[in-house]
């Protein structure tokens, strides 16, 4: 299995927490990404939205467009409205040659609300999962037809946070809905990366690799602290610096993930 290594600009600048790198320039982010040996990047708030401008800034640094976050609301939205909502970003990604588009379910999310504790997030069980799965599959099929596969990002603070919720979404959706396995978010939510790879390896078309500091995780009060509070406390760290076994993840990925060429970062 061939893996391409990309980077996320959130390592330099957090769009939800301007105090974390808000004054770091896009030039610094991209030049250091390439200097570190990565061949691609995701988008972020500082990236151009014009396709020609985006292509130019990427080419200047010899970087490909890996992907970028899309704030979806299909769990409480109709398909036609969602198709209209995603259209500009999908067209941008298509023109610049993104490998995938990252779908995060953000209806009533608390991921970017520092005044809301983690426990106040929406719960998947409160929605019609079967209907959600049908809409999500249709959206993913549309993205695939446009040449930009969709990858679903389970995320802390959203309606799809836990391993059980992720399992339910995978069961309710068709093959067009790829899975972005975020190793750090899954462990933060109490999940098992090895189990998810074994169950859903054929659906994984993108990775986010980060690590978790066990001591910080153990001290989190989910009824009092927000996701952004946890970020500021340092719950996340770089792969190899925390509690996640990446040797095991890589070995299992070689067994269970069939797609030969996908970005991994």
Placement of each model-derived feature along the sequence:
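Short, flexible, mixed-charge acidic loops at enzyme active sites
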Residues: 20-24, 108-118, 217-229
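Single conserved hydrophobic/aromatic residue that forms the stacking wall/gate
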Residues: 255-265
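Active-site mouth loops of central-metabolism enzymes
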Residues: 11-24, 74-82, 121-128
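Short, acidic/polar
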Residues: 18-32, 82-92, 189-197, 246
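Acidic/histidine-rich catalytic cores of soluble enzymes
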Residues: 41, 133-243
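Acidic (Asp/Glu)-rich catalytic clusters
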Residues: 2, 31-35, 49-67, 88-98, ...
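Active-site acidic/histidine proton-transfer and metal-coordination neighborhood
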Residues: 79-178
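Active-site beta-loop-alpha junctions enriched in small/polar residues
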Residues: 10-12, 44-46, 70-74, 106-108, ...
């Amino acid at each position: 299995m061939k893996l391409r290594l990309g980077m996320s600009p959130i390592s330099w600048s957090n769009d939800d927490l301007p105090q974390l790198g808000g004054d770091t320039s896009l030039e610094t982010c991209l030049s250091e990404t390439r200097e570190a040996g990565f061949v691609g990047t995701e988008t972020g708030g500082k990236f151009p939205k014009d396709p020609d401008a985006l292509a130019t800034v990427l080419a200047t640094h010899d970087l490909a467009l890996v992907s970028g976050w899309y704030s979806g609301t299909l769990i409480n939205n109709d398909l036609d409205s969602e198709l209209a909502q995603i259209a500009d970003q999908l067209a941008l990604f298509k023109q610049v040659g993104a490998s995938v588009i990252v779908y995060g379910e953000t209806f009533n999310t608390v991921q970017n609300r520092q005044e809301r504790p983690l426990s106040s997030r929406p719960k998947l069980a409160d929605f019609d999962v079967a209907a959600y799965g049908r809409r999500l599959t249709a959206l993913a099929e549309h993205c695939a037809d446009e040449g930009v596969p969709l990858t679903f990002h389970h995320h802390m603070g959203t309606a799809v946070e836990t391993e059980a919720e992720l399992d339910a979404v995978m069961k309710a959706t068709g093959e067009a809905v790829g899975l972005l396995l975020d190793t750090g978010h899954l462990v933060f939510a109490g999940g098992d990366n090895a189990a998810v790879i074994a169950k859903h390896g054929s659906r994984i078309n993108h990775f986010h690799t980060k690590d978790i500091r066990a001591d910080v995780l153990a001290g989190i009060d989910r009824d009092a602290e927000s996701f952004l509070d946890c970020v500021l406390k340092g719950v996340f760290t770089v792969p190899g610096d925390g509690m996640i076994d990446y040797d095991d993840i890589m070995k299992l990925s070689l067994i269970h993930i069939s797609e030969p060429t996908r970005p991994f970062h």
